[in-house]
Amino acid sequence: MGTQTLEVPVRSEASVSPAPPDLNAIPALTERVRIGTLGWIGPGFVLVGRSVLIIAAQAITAGVLWLQSHSWSWNAAAKWWTVYGTLADVGCLALMAGYTRKEGIRLRDLIGRVRLHWGRDVFLGIGMFLLVFPFFILGAASATRIVYGSGQPPSFAGLADARVLPLWGIIYSFSLWWLIWSPTEEMTYRGYAFPRFEVLCRNRGLAIGLVSFWWTLQHVFLPFILDWKLVLWRFLAFLPGVVILLLPSLKIRRLGPFVFAHWPMDVVGVFMTLKL
């Protein structure tokens, strides 16, 4: 009886498809700065523009309410922030789409790979949430002491907290607002602005400071209530958590874990501010 040889197929190196290039990585961004497709205008407009768009969305809401009641009230629009915030998201996505197109990339390239095998990004996001969320709580407590001189946080019932919305507004706030808001916010500051300022400034510390400032300031404007103490309180309350949450971007460039960390924060925010 002749012997039979068992042949094991060997994968050719040529058959293994290489990983797609990271078009949002520092080397790729540096090259686009060199050839002139990336400059200061895009990152600057997007970084500042999100706050401007949030204020504009509140102004539009105030205008709609004025048409309904014939009584102008900026603060009356404030309680709708988990509804009109999506208008700012749409504007922000449009801005980023325009500027990324000039760079020759897509919006999707800002997100990077999403690793869901064995729930990798989900669990990493949960870990980040548990690590960072206490800094927002400590920030709020410290800001209350600094601004108001007591342990009692400010109350703007019906505006920033204890908000009363119709049923459809409540459903939208709990179902769609946070699903859109969190990834758009992450794309704006972490996916688009931060790596570009890191390259343009040639200084990580400066890039962190610049993006952290505007990312924190965004929370002052959602909603924007004309009270200087509240403005200062909200800025100081969010600053520590924003800085801590931005630092992992020095190592982790993918947005997946951060979106999974951000979603529960925004859901908690809806629960804490809506009167059910």
Kindly label every feature range from the protein language model:
Residues 1-120, 141, 145, 267-276:
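N-terminal, membrane-interfacial amphipathic/helix-forming hydrophobic leader that caps
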Residues 39-46, 77-85, 89, 120-125, ...:
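Residue-level signature of transmembrane alpha-helical entry/exit and packing/kink sites
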Residues 55, 118-124, 130, 195, ...:
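Residues in flexible loops and secondary-structure boundaries
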Residues 66-82, 105-181:
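Juxtamembrane helix-loop-helix connectors linking adjacent transmembrane helices
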Residues 102, 147, 225-228:
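Juxtamembrane transmembrane-helix termini
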Residues 134-137, 155-158, 163-276:
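Transmembrane helix-loop-helix hairpins at the membrane interface
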